[in-house]
Amino acid sequence: MANHYSALKRARQTETRTARNRANTSRMRTQLRALRTAIAGGDAAQVKTEFSGTVSLLDKAVQKGVLHKNTASRYKARLSARVKAKTSK
């Protein structure tokens, strides 16, 4: 356990930030799972709405520092290819 006031404060800040990052990561992963399920399911309209929501959440995760911008870009590119393949049939 930290003894200095500044170390105690940093520990508190770390707990707060960890909880916030965990919530944002969980929200993002849930949305990704929903999109992948929709792609596997088949309804093209649902896939498009899920995709737009997923892209929005990925961009928000980048803004909040949860994801690196290149990681989010990679996710979006791969998901976009899967959505395009699914909706073009």
Curated annotation (Swiss-Prot):
Q: Where is this region: Disordered?
A: 1-28
Protein role: Binds directly to 16S ribosomal RNA.
Family membership, please give it.
Answer: Belongs to the bacterial ribosomal protein bS20 family.
What's the protein here called? Answer: Small ribosomal subunit protein bS20
Output the Gene Ontology terms for molecular function: small ribosomal subunit rRNA binding; structural constituent of ribosome
TM stretches of this protein: none
Q: What PANTHER family does this protein map onto?
A: 30S RIBOSOMAL PROTEIN S20, SMALL RIBOSOMAL SUBUNIT PROTEIN BS20C
Query: Which InterPro entries has this protein been placed in?
Result: Ribosomal_bS20, Ribosomal_bS20_sf
UniProt keyword list = Ribonucleoprotein, Ribosomal protein, RNA-binding, rRNA-binding
Q: What is the gene name?
A: rpsT
UniProt GO cellular component terms: cytosol; small ribosomal subunit
Matching entries from NCBIfam families are given as: S20
GO biological process terms, alphabetically, are:
translation
